[in-house]
Amino acid sequence: MTVSKILKQIIDSQTTKNVVIGQLGLGSITKLKQLITLLAHHKDKQLTLKLFVDISDTSGILLANEELTTLLCPQGSISLTAIEGCQRVIVSNCKLTIDFYLGQYLTQLQALPMVNDGFVDGWHVTSDADQTQLRQILFWQLAKLSKNDAQFSLDDTFTEVSQLELYTQAEQVGLYRYADNIPGNIQSGDEICFQERAAMRAQSRALQAPYPICSAAVTTHATCSNLGIAIIGGGVASACLALSLAERGQQVTLFCEDHALAQAASGNKQGAIYPLLTPDNNTLSQYFQQAYLFSLQRLKSLAAQGHPIDFDLCGVVHTGHDERSRKRVAKIINGQNWQPSIARAITAEQASSIAGLKIDDGGIFYPMGGWVSPQDFTRAAFNQAKAIAGASLKLNTQITDIHYKDGGWELTSNTERFGSFKALILANGKSITQFPQTQYLQATGFRGQVSHVPSRAKLSKLSSVLCAHGYMTPSNNTLHCLGASYVKNAPNTDYCPNEQVENLHKIQHSYVGQEWVEDIDVSGHSARVGVRMVTRDHAPMMGPAPDIDSIMTLYQDHQLTPQSRKYWQSHNAPVHQGLYVLGGLGSRGLSSGPLAAESLAAQICGDLMPISRDFVALLNPNRMWMRKLLKGKALEVGVEV
């Protein structure tokens, strides 16, 4: 049988709506095209294809293949990049999701967070898979992630010897070959395999205990007693979350206190999209690269679907503004062998050519980055959620209280009550700490004033986003944006003349002596002020809302001893059931927010998230407290950690 026929029979045999197929090896573009076409035709099912691909010269070329990018998004280019980790692509009008896991097979499989028991319906191995990695320890990882009746198949181009060896290894972990017209049967020795799988899943969950992964009791059908999922917010993060939930068939209601979407931190005329990189490419840096790629995909996909979005992926030129920052920029670009599509070193001459203006410093160029209108991005994401699953929006509705009762969340405004909702997500930016349940979250508000200056003379030639001490965008509707101020716990969001001048000074300081800087005119007092919530480690907050009262109660009995460290390592940290947090996006929420939203939607619905277990820990809202508890350090609520 061909691979397509085998997988078609596996898919057809499943009674559940969600079907997951795993594959080791990328295969040829022709075969991958056949597979994607096959999966896309199953309109009655929600299909996920998980491709585990070793990073090599060959796979890098295939990932960049123009035919593949066109296949993934016929109306717009989707860029895959050979970096380790998961890159999620949503195709076929959200009925097919493809996760590209790049790197060593075993490493990628072991990094997957456990959301529920086995979820993979069938595994396939292509002839181009690295057979040196196909060892017994790998097959046990496949089994750990599989349903009990999951099937196993190989390309028919394998030699008879290789087929015999691989099928034997698969059978030893309870994965059986799919035979023509014969449904899989549980073998007599499988109970031992199933027990081993359960033990491996328990081990994985134990590793996740400090940063729990919690699904909600949601269904795809709202009822009188269950109105689905509520989101409090109104910016890019909440709109992208609504879209990710809608793609899973969820009924979503978004509560926004303003007269329209994107009136707070997401209300700027232009916002830059580019990754946050570190010299050592730490976990934060790795997350931002994957998030950046997903954000670009979301943006391009929404635009291709006809949503009006002002954006220009014209690239971002990042230079230093003094000796210290120049050394930092050099340390970043020289610290790793970055993929050229992510970041590459440029000279002063190259920077000037790219930007269209004279620049005296070299630095970093992010070729796929650029700017987007956050308001347009927000509206497009929500309108798409409304189109595919009827997401609803309640404007001018300020929620003043949230209350958990009888297995659901009830919301109260000044005039109405809403609910009950099986899940509630707080994605309300600067107000994320307004409720008792989240008042101690470690995120701080920073006021940011963005100045608007008319495009004129030499300044009008700017053709890429500039980033140094401050940032400046190419013109859109005859205006450039530059900024932004950074004022902690500011008392208001009124226009500030001093901050307007400070924004100009930042550009002057960054590009000393350049004639084009003289064309920047801030005298029109045109600006916009917002508040972005910033975490100390610069990572977003995504996950179940921590129950700090319960944590502190347990802390009284488990603190400052070796035994207490073991306790926090092995017990699930307390959370508020059905309550989730999406916030702390800081100044790069356009880059980090959409993937955080997609991951949270997956967690809520009990799906596998497109991020690693390390990323789950990085983003978890309880991480500041848990880092201290896991080290046996003292904990004090209300103090920044």
UniProtKB/Swiss-Prot annotation:
Predominant location category: cytoplasm
Region FAD-dependent cmnm(5)s(2)U34 oxidoreductase, residue ranges: 232-641
Known catalytic reactions: 5-aminomethyl-2-thiouridine(34) in tRNA + S-adenosyl-L-methionine = 5-methylaminomethyl-2-thiouridine(34) in tRNA + S-adenosyl-L-homocysteine + H(+)
Statement: the UniProt record of this protein carries the keyword Transport: no
Enzyme nomenclature, EC number: 2.1.1.61, 1.5.-.-
GO terms for MF: flavin adenine dinucleotide binding; oxidoreductase activity, acting on the CH-NH group of donors; tRNA (5-methylaminomethyl-2-thiouridylate)(34)-methyltransferase activity
InterPro entries: FAD-dep_OxRdtase (IPR006076), FAD/NAD-bd_sf (IPR036188), tRNA_MAMT_biosynth_bifunc_MnmC (IPR023032), tRNA_S-uridine_synth_MnmC_C (IPR017610)
Database matches in SUPFAM superfamilies: FAD/NAD(P)-binding domain (SSF51905)
Cell compartments where the protein resides: Cytoplasm
Region span, tRNA (mnm(5)s(2)U34)-methyltransferase: 1-219
Function: Catalyzes the last two steps in the biosynthesis of 5-methylaminomethyl-2-thiouridine (mnm(5)s(2)U) at the wobble position (U34) in tRNA. Catalyzes the FAD-dependent demodification of cmnm(5)s(2)U34 to nm(5)s(2)U34, followed by the transfer of a methyl group from S-adenosyl-L-methionine to nm(5)s(2)U34, to form mnm(5)s(2)U34.
Protein name: tRNA 5-methylaminomethyl-2-thiouridine biosynthesis bifunctional protein MnmC
Organism of this sequence: Shewanella pealeana (strain ATCC 700345 / ANG-SQ1)
Name of encoding gene: mnmC
